[in-house]
Amino acid sequence: KIKMATLVSPGILVKERDLTNMVIGESSSDGAIAITAEKGPVEEVVTVSNEVELVEAFGKPNASTFEWFFTAASFLKYAATLRVVRINSGHVNAGVSGTPILVKNSEHWLANFSDGSANVGQWAARTPGTWGNNLKVWQCPSLTVYEQKLAANNRVNGALAEGVTAVVLDNVDENNYAVVVDDIISFTSDAAGATPLAGHEGVEYIVTAVNTGTNTLTVKQHNVFSTKGLAAVVANESYITRRWRWYEQFENAPGTSTSVSNKSGSGDEMHILITDEDGGISGVANTILEKFEGVSKASDAKTESGDNNNYIDVIYNQSSYVYW
């Protein structure tokens, strides 16, 4: 028998204890909370398991939402999951019609807006809140919009000096041959657009303004972080090739899908691109957020693998930012 030592004066007694039979398990507690948030579905339960998922679903905290956010975040520090519902606090979805609308969540969109009968504009932000004001949806519905040789229908009207930013055309809004803001143009010496003007090889210009009264475009060099004007002189009656703003982001111009071609149709494809116009989402203005290549305007169009390729359905199933 082993006797324990007895201390007759102040001192330290060391004892060993085997704790290997104790297992501390992870928390299995679940919680629920209703919050206000800058983004995210309204009146829909979203289950999150950490703060990263909370931010992805409902955005970062701000002056109006921080109390709710940090209450939820604090619970997640010791809980397994948290069910979060965003309160309907008067926000509406950003859209193109100018008429305020509220699309609470996907189920609400399917029941009230998916067939287009609500007639409230072509696009709406995926969830309510001012965050959607940053979004811009770009569409390229045809080969002509993607790229067009203006030929003799709309040429440069008057010689231009190197460095200038004002380009006068015969008619900037010529029917079927117009040039609009954000178009990309280049100058050639031939109507077919095959031969660039001397000094303009590999140089394109983005249109930043259009004056229909004077038929004048304001341009700057494309993909150059400055306001540089023309790289060289431009002769009177030079030819122009016009392209869609984001043409270089897609492999080819939209055409006809195999699905529609097999049914004797044509011209159903379109490209869609979504940008962070103001930089409020990504931190950098005009950042590309999403792009959808060769989606179809035909309601029954299919991809080569048999999936639905109608652009409304593709946007609904794949976009994180908008509804049609």
Question: Where on the chain are the PLM-derived regions?
Answer:
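Short amphipathic, basic-aromatic surface patches that mediate peripheral association
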Residues: N171-E174, W246-N262
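Short, surface-exposed beta-strand/loop "edge" segments at domain boundaries and coil↔beta transitions
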Residues: K39-E44, L54-V55, H91-G95, P128-L135, ...
